[in-house]
Swiss-Prot record:
GO terms for molecular function: arginine-tRNA ligase activity; ATP binding. This is Arginine--tRNA ligase. The gene is argS. Its EC number is 6.1.1.19. The keyword Nucleus does not apply. It comes from Oceanobacillus iheyensis (strain DSM 14371 / CIP 107618 / JCM 11309 / KCTC 3954 / HTE831).
Length: 556
């Protein structure tokens, strides 16, 4: 628990004591005390509505209760400078600021580990994300899915959870047959044959590149082979090449998976039959019109779902149910899927399946990723200028840089549509939040280099009590918030809060730096304190940037 958390906990304890001392409630009647941080600094450092919560028990007006609590509060023990009553009975606390200096020591001693905690208690969380069909390039929606999933995993890890990243390979459905036919057609075209693409073929540039690679490797070896033999080869070759390309693009995007799970393994190991047997034994299946159905309506779905079609083939739902059973059987405490917005309707049937299989449904969660709209020169970009197809992750990384793509794709909540302005993302100005944040880090690094060149000892002892300017105190409070912010982001699955935090801290840093002089030969003691503060801000920025997977440059 860091110094800010300790201060908050101490204040809660003293409020509790004041309630008892004022005889407003008994021990078992005191509700959980919730402290909020007012957006307006004029309302103090913390505020609580405890007086309103106690009105019925104490049989008094909330403002009178608030006055009673304020009069009985041990301000010294609570590190409170003053208390104000506002509105119908809110209590605003203005804290003594002397404790804030301890934040610097906390940050500098923890170094790269500052912000991390053990709050997750090693709980095992699996996050399955991206999982796009291996049939072409990764596009904008996949890229946002990748950024969100990866940063969510980083947040979980920083908050003390044991995290596993997984990619589910859809390698058993008809899309692999279409992939083989598509690669076959492109291969034959590359060697000069007049062949049309299959009706359901994949048109992307990635398939053309795979075919060119094969021609370079094998020449016309496959031109006269038996069609079935050739198609089997093209399916496997296309699958491996597509997965290799996807993995390469994701790795360059700084996203790496712990486990790549093959859908085919569910068929080979008999896991699908085992899953169907469990559903049948529970009385959750029935036959109608020659098909096998799942009674999902018993669990709140709007209609029952087909598991095995009349032709004997499985629906997409069946292996998906077996896959989720497999996940929970591996011992994860929680499984989280990151899906596109077109999968929203799939959630109720998967919840129904897990309930029917006997698993606690609260172990399963889905995060929906909304669309990305790309803009350039004020116009919406629908197609790539280079390929005439949808803009790929690879193109976007090459065009605007990995840092910018990752930052922007986790800058907003996953359930909000995202407008990505390519011109802004490439600009080196304070209007670009990525540049603005990274410049804050580089600015401190430059200042520290100047300090050394001017003869200041950047490792000198310092007196944090000299940091009394409002902008200094704002920085101290903000860097002290990092650990709890990470815990909250993990609890609420909101990695965009880390990006927001980075921007807010960078804003405070620039405001301070523009208003105050750090290196002052006439006030060496304060200079040493401010250097220490700048080092703590730099470390905090770097740690937060590591979580969202962007670089913290020393020069710009």
């Amino acid at each position: 628990m860091n110094v800010l958390e300790q201060t908050e906990q101490k204040l809660k304890e003293q409020i509790h004591h004041a309630v008892i001392h004022a005889e407003l409630a008994t021990e078992d009647q005191v509700p959980d005390i919730i402290l909020e941080k007012p957006k307006d600094k004029a309302h103090g450092d913390f505020a609580t509505n405890i007086a309103m919560q106690l009105a019925r028990v104490a049989k008094k007006a909330p403002r009178q209760i608030a006055d009673d609590i304020a009069s009985k509060l041990n301000k010294s023990e609570a590190s409170v400078e003053k208390v104000e009553i506002a509105g119908p009975g809110f209590i605003n606390f203005f804290m003594k600021q002397d404790f804030l200096g301890e934040v610097i020591d906390t940050v500098l001693s923890a170094g790269d580990n500052y912000g991390k905690s053990t709050g997750g208690n090693g709980e095992k969380v699996q996050v399955e994300f991206v999982s796009v069909n291996p049939t072409g390039d990764l596009h904008l929606g996949h890229a946002r899915n990748a950024a969100f999933g990866d940063v969510l995993c980083n947040v979980f890890a920083a908050a003390g959870y044991e995290v596993e990243r997984e990619y589910y390979i859809n390698d058993a459905g008809n899309q692999i047959n279409n992939l083989g036919l598509s690669v076959e057609a492109r291969y034959l075209q590359e060697i000069g044959q007049d062949v049309d693409m299959p009706e359901d073929g994949y048109q992307g540039q990635a398939i053309i590149e795979i075919a060119k690679e094969l021609v370079k490797k094998d020449g016309e070896k496959w031109a006269d082979k038996d069609h079935e033999e050739r198609l089997d080869f093209f399916k496997e070759y296309g699958l491996k090449a597509s997965l290799r390309n996807i993995e390469s693009d994701l790795k360059d995007f700084r996203v790496e998976f712990d486990h790549w799970f093959s859908e085919r393994s569910l068929f080979k190991d008999g896991q699908i039959d085992d899953t169907l047997a469990v559903l049948d034994d529970g009385g959750y299946t029935f036959e109608k019109d020659g098909a096998l159905w799942f009674k999902t309506t018993e669990f709140g779905d709007d209609k029952d779902r087909v598991l095995i079609k009349g032709d004997g083939n499985y629906t997409y739902l069946t292996p998906d149910i077996a896959y989720h059973k497999n996940k929970l059987d591996r011992g994860f405490d929680r499984i989280i899927n990151v899906w596109g917005s077109d999968h929203h309707g799939y959630i109720p049937r998967m919840r129904a399946a897990l309930q029917a299989l006997g698993y606690p449904v609260e172990k399963f969660d889905v995060k929906i990723i909304q669309m990305v709209n790309l803009f350039e020169a004020g116009e919406k970009v629908k197609m790539s200028k280079r390929t005439g197809k949808a803009v790929s992750l690879r193109e976007l990384m090459d065009e605007v840089g990995i840092d910018a793509v990752r930052y922007y794709f986790v800058a907003r909540s996953n359930d909000s549509q995202l407008d990505f302005d390519m011109d802004l993302a490439k600009s080196q100005s304070n209007d670009n939040p990525v540049y603005y944040a990274q410049y804050a880090h580089a600015r401190i690094c430059t200042m520290l280099s100047q300090a050394k060149s001017k003869g200041f000892n950047t490792e000198a002892e310092f007196d944090a009590s000299l940091l009394t300017a409002e902008k200094e105190l704002d920085l101290l409070k903000k860097i002290g918030e990092l650990p709890q912010m990470i815990v909250d982001a993990a609890d609420k699955h909101t990695p965009h809060k880390v990006t927001q935090y980075i921007f807010e801290l960078a804003t405070l840093l620039h405001s301070f730096y523009n208003a105050e002089k750090v290196l002052d030969a006439d006030n060496e003691a304060r200079t040493h304190a401010r250097i220490a503060l700048m080092k703590a801000v730099r470390q905090t920025l770097a740690n937060a940037m590591t979580i969202i997977g962007i670089s913290a440059p020393e020069k710009m």
